[in-house]
Amino acid sequence: MSGSYPFIDIAALDSVREGFARGDAQLVLAHDLSTVLWVNGPGAKLFGYNRVEDLIEGQLDLPVATRRQIAAFSSENTSAPSAVAVRLGGGLRSELTHLHVSNIKLPDGVAALLVATQMPDNSAEAAISGLGDDSTHIALVDAVGKVVAASLRFALLDISASTLEDLIVEAGDATDRIVKRRIRTGSHSVPGAIARLTDTPALHLLCIVGDAPAQFQTAAEAVPLPDNAEAVLEEILPEQGDAPAQQAQKTHAEQPRPKTFAFDHDAPPARFIWKVGPDGTFSEISPDLAAVVGPNSADMVGRRFSDVANVFGFDTDGSIAALLLERDTWSGKRLLWPVEGTRLRVPVELAALPVYSRDREFLGFRGFGIVRPAEAEADPEEIGLALAGGIPQNRKPRKEPAETARMVGEDDVLALSEEVANDDQPAAVLPKPPLDITPTPGRRDSDKVISLLNSCAQEKVAADQAKFLKEKERATRPEGGLTKTERNAFREIAERLRKQGLANTRAESETPVSETSSIEPVEPTPPVKTRSEPIQPDETALLANLPVPVIIHSGDAIHYVNQALLDITGYESLDDIRSAGGVDVLFNSESDDGETRQSMVLRHADGSEEPVDAHLNAIAWRGGRALMLSLMPVTAADLPAPAELPAANDEEKQALEAHVEELKTILDTATDGVVLIDPEGRIRSMNHSASALFGYERDEAEGKFFSMLFAIESQRAAMDYLHGLSGNGVLSVLNDGREVIGREAKGGFIPLFMTIGKLPHTRGFCAVLRDITQWKRTEEELTNARKEAERASNQKTEFLARISHEIRTPLNAIIGFSELMADEKFGPIGNDRYRDYLRDINRSGNHVLALVNDLLDISKIEAGALDMQFEAVSLNDAIGEAIALMQPQANRERVIIRSSFQSNLPDIVADSRSIKQVALNLLSNAVRFTAPGRQVIVSTSYELNGDVVMRVRDTGIGMSKSEVEQALKPFRQINALERRKAESAKDWRNEGTGLGLPLTKAMVEANRAQFAIDSNPGQGTVVEIVFPPTRVLAD
């Protein structure tokens, strides 16, 4: 992509990146409104271009009206986007499009205009559409390194997942969100850049500049034809002894290709692109496949993969169908595809990437494949004939695979697969037209093959090989013990064997292995003709030359050792190692004192030993599975220096023994049980307390599993605790112990608290166990006491509720009849003293009824069973009703009641009945304990913090702090009569029951309000009730 500015630099600008990630159409214009400085794929499509390169640095011919509208905005000195409605298009069709125009600063500080609009297709594929070509590759990568969308040839780069993760971390740390460096792609490193577009969720734009790896190029693309290719070809044809065939080839070269399909067996491998939808239906197949297998055989668009597999007879195990359902990256799947008009089928290797929209909606798979016509084999079902309706008349059927396979000479030299041997090299393959080779009896096939490379071509191959080794050596990072070239060769063989072994598993970035070529050391030869099975490369070709000792084995059976291992161990051959005992004789895991070694030791043939570092890989080996063990001798510099301990004399030894005995005595004196455990979970020893706690003798418990000390229900918890400490997780730091149930030797159970710690040198553990029987007993007693208190409270509440109902019935009768007799409705009483008695009976009855009601209310409040109806309550009206009820009593006591209500006081959320009761109780107490001639003031206010406050202030006798505490307790009264004058003293019926303030406070708290009282002797009392803002219905 050309342009004065790198594409990714502008894409990473703050004003551009988020819209780019959403798939908006974006266009950056110079202030002349004609020069396009930058555009993304949707933006190019909006103005009628398919590629970004077609528009960048070009001239955009905008309509005059559109140019005028955008120019009007560009004159404004603001960075805020402005909406502009313009008509794009021409002729008979012109659509109204809403554009957002904003002023931006380019990376070099130059001012420009950003024109953007949302597009209906906001998928990830749409965001990078119009980008990427043969040398430029684009991808969107999420926060974990998963490719969300990519250009057509991006998958061919073979970028590993670890490389993508490193790029994401670097982009996150960069101040400008952009990282530009060379990026590893397979065996190459090419220029690239990554930019973070969004943070939540994280999305990155990755741009790679460079050609696809060589192993993805066909032989025709990778190798230039020698200058004398035609002359050499003419040398081949006479030697075949087939003049008609020669004439037919010349005619084929002179005439155009016929319209009917003809299979070209000698064609190089071809790559093709395919797409399937979320339901597995093919939506696109590139014509490269039809060019090899025929148009009828490649006609799959609109068909489901399962239907095609059933017709063509591949994927019989359903492995590819299962991968299409898993929605994950996969590769390396090989199947046999029927060839139209023949009795053959060709191998096809497939790989695919899942495709998601911007909303993470699964859209299907995008994949590529490689078809290898040179490896065609016979199709027993002859599906290709059915596809073409029979063998064409003008075409001879090719040789059967069995006959062709006999053409391969046994002495042909095998080389590495193209994946290893031809990396970064041009393949020595000469494409030629199809021709039939008729075998000649008594003559080897290798004699028929004449080199097509002259001396110049051979020199070029040698130069390419030298260049390949040099680049590989330079690209490899240093590791200890090997040269760069040796390290590269070892990695190549390990990677190749691993890919062969995992051919049927999914790999995120693995690419299909290209075809095998055969190259002789002196005279390179072209690939061998078709065979029934591809010749496998000799796995030992590279292993034999490695300086690293390598062993291929399965269990105790050794399949192969290289010369480096024989040299280091001193054995003559593999048979000598097998005769000596195989794998067991090579490695010694125990030292002379019988202890297990921490490192691996290689034993030589003469009995000497050498420490080594080992690396184990699972590989495919000659049709099966095996393990490849590579060894690296450990030098003296790598070994830890042995600790030089001074020789201890007898006195120091005795002192140490005495110190150990003292420590053992201290442990035996401790009341807690101490148990030492080895790394396998067995008991090493225990102190006297542990022995007495469980009833085991020391020697009786040693060597047994630690779990034997616990009941069955606690064994799992104890062992999980032990295993959790063996690692370096959170449990090893936050070690808070466990409560477990111990099991005595005689079967009894003990509640224990156990703490386990790690021992530093022996890798064992130390468990400290404490008997918590007394704690459990105390805990049980407290629990029982709490339950008993709760039961007593419930009984009291039930008793008060029952007695109140039993008393009310006769009490109401007494009060009612006394009022009836005092009114003399059925006749005069005739004596004033009887009338006084009736009034006393009525007053006493009401007093007892109030007492019963208070008892019932406070018991309900304590039990949480008070029936309250929360609603909007006008506090001023409730207090006014209470004042009206108390005014007659205040008049009798000659006490003045004043009120100060705030206007427009908002309502509160409360129970109306209880609020009135609270106001009556507070006014009653204030009037009762205020001397005649003094006053009681009731006020309300609306505070700035949203609280609604009610205050009741009196100028009565007041109380001290201790008296306030006494008055707030139920059934407690202060001795207020001592401070009253004798003439103003009242009888007990006017002194209350001691429930007024406690009941008032309980009702206030039941209404979610706050109760406060402040009183001073001789000055009066102030009671304040505060309703918080959550209980206020403010406008």
Swiss-Prot record:
Gene3D superfamilies: 1.10.287.130, Histidine kinase-like ATPase, C-terminal domain, PAS domain
Reactions the enzyme catalyzes: ATP + protein L-histidine = ADP + protein N-phospho-L-histidine
Region described as Important for polar localization: spans on this chain: 1-613
EC number: 2.7.13.3
GO cellular component: cytoplasm; plasma membrane
UniProt KW Cell division keyword: yes
Domain Histidine kinase positions: 802-1031
GO molecular function, one term: ATP binding
Domain PAS stretches: 659-730
Subcellular location as annotated: Cytoplasm
SMART domains, A to Z: HATPase_c, HisKA, PAS
Lineage: superkingdom: Bacteria
Residues that bear Phosphohistidine: H805
Biological process per Gene Ontology, one example term: cell division
NCBIfam families: histid_kinase_PdhS, sensory_box
Function: Functions as a polar differentiation marker. Essential protein that, by localizing in the old pole of dividing cells, controls cell division and maturation, probably through control of DivK phosphorylation status and cellular distribution, which in turn regulates CtrA, a transcriptional regulator of the minB operon. The asymmetrical localization of this protein is probably required for cells to enter a new division cycle.
Protein name: Cell-division control histidine kinase PdhS
Gene (UniProt): pdhS
